Amino acid sequence: MTESTTSDVVLTSEQIAGLLPHRYPFALVDRVIAHDPGVSATAIKNVTMNEPQFQGHFPERPLMPGVLIVEAMAQVGGLIVTQMPDLPKGLFVFAGIDGVRFRRPVVPGDQLVIRCELLSLKRKRFGKVKAEATVDGDLACSGELMFSLVD
């Protein structure tokens, strides 16, 4: 995947809320900095200490749970397909996760840069994205995420 060279906001948090169904505390994309509908997206997730998961994961050494990193990547993947013309209306949900690996801890104060690229879309109902999340240029998580349309 190519590195984004822009820090301009392409989609604000308000615009993202108009495209994705997720709401607090599960809205995990703060802004989109690059977006090619139907092809790829790059977004930012600012990790802050006042997020609810850090009360229990772990109070003495807060770490962002891996499942939330994967969910943030999936939400960025969802932004790719929400802007595609000719897709049926409905909700895209997880259908599978392949090859996900965690390479470094993500902690409060980090900024996740999440890049997703659409690998395939079959029958306008089943899709696969390649996703990676980095912090300060270091790979934190990567994998392939599958989704399907729920009528």
From Swiss-Prot:
First-tier enzyme category under EC: lyase
Cited Gene3D superfamilies: Hotdog Thioesterase
Subcellular location: Cytoplasm
One GO term (biological process): fatty acid biosynthetic process
Any Gene Ontology CC annotation: cytoplasm
Chemical reaction(s) catalysed: a (3R)-hydroxyacyl-[ACP] = a (2E)-enoyl-[ACP] + H2O
Enzyme Commission number(s) of this protein: 4.2.1.59
Function according to Swiss-Prot or TrEMBL: Involved in unsaturated fatty acids biosynthesis. Catalyzes the dehydration of short chain beta-hydroxyacyl-ACPs and long chain saturated and unsaturated beta-hydroxyacyl-ACPs.
UniProt name for this protein: 3-hydroxyacyl-[acyl-carrier-protein] dehydratase FabZ
Annotated organism of origin: Synechococcus sp. (strain CC9605)
Lineage: Bacteria, Bacillati, Cyanobacteriota, Cyanophyceae, Synechococcales
